[in-house]
């Protein structure tokens, strides 16, 4: 059940890692711009300088964190596809849970369980929303009536007529 074409697994990991880095850097840059602007001293010049400093300092770090998450998630997902032999939403849900657990391993088993639960629930919600959107979009374009391709099954009154007359008389 593949809705869209994706790269094969070795390249998918690199692609997802780069996409996550880009998303984290851009999103983190926007967030840090507001945060740096808000936390700077009064004055437009001070606030703009504080905003740019916050962007330069934190946006690459956030991008790197997102890249680690995306790379680990894709690696586990590709491993699940290889082991199970099929690509379905359960791979993504399990990959999200395992990614959360692995990234929280330094904080202890309680944090691992909590992060695994959050990762699994988050990915289950994302996969569920994707399935619902796919079903809703497919309901917008129902299959029309199917036409018979074999004209021998049609009665002679419904056969398409030729602009050059009735060709059956020469058979």
Curated annotation (Swiss-Prot):
Keyword Transmembrane helix: yes
Residue pairs linked by disulfide bridges in the UniProt entry: 9-78
Compartment list: Mitochondrion inner membrane
Protein's membrane topology: Multi-pass membrane protein
GO biological process, one term: positive regulation of protein processing
Gene: Timm17a
Oligomeric form and interacting partners: Component of the TIM23 complex at least composed of TIMM23, TIMM17 (TIMM17A or TIMM17B) and TIMM50. The complex interacts with the TIMM44 component of the PAM complex and with DNAJC15.
Gene Ontology molecular function: protein transmembrane transporter activity
Function statement: Essential component of the TIM23 complex, a complex that mediates the translocation of transit peptide-containing proteins across the mitochondrial inner membrane.
Keywords attached to this entry: Disulfide bond, Membrane, Mitochondrion, Mitochondrion inner membrane, Protein transport, Translocation, Transmembrane, Transmembrane helix, Transport
Protein name: Mitochondrial import inner membrane translocase subunit Tim17-A
Transmembrane segments: 17-37, 63-77, 113-133
Family: Belongs to the Tim17/Tim22/Tim23 family.
Organism: Rattus norvegicus (Rat)
Region described as Disordered: spans on this chain: 147-171
């Amino acid at each position: 059940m593949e809705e869209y074409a994706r790269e094969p697994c070795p390249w998918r990991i690199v692609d997802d890692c780069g996409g996550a880095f880009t998303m984290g850097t851009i999103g983190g840059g926007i967030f840090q711009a507001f945060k740096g602007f808000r936390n700077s001293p009064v004055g437009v010049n001070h606030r703009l300088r504080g905003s740019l400093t916050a962007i330069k300092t934190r946006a690459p770090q956030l991008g790197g964190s997102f890249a680690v998450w995306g790379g680990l998630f894709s690696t586990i997902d590709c491993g699940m596809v290889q082991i199970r032999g099929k690509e379905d939403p359960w791979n993504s849900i399990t990959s999200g849970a395992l990614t959360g657990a692995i990234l929280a391993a330094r904080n202890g088993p309680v944090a691992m369980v909590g992060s695994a639960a959050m990762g699994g629930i988050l990915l289950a919600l994302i996969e569920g929303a994707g399935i619902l959107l796919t079903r809703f979009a497919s309901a917008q374009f129902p299959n029309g009536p199917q036409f018979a391709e074999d004209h021998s099954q049609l009665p002679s009154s419904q056969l398409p007529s030729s602009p050059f007359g009735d060709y059956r008389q020469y058979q």
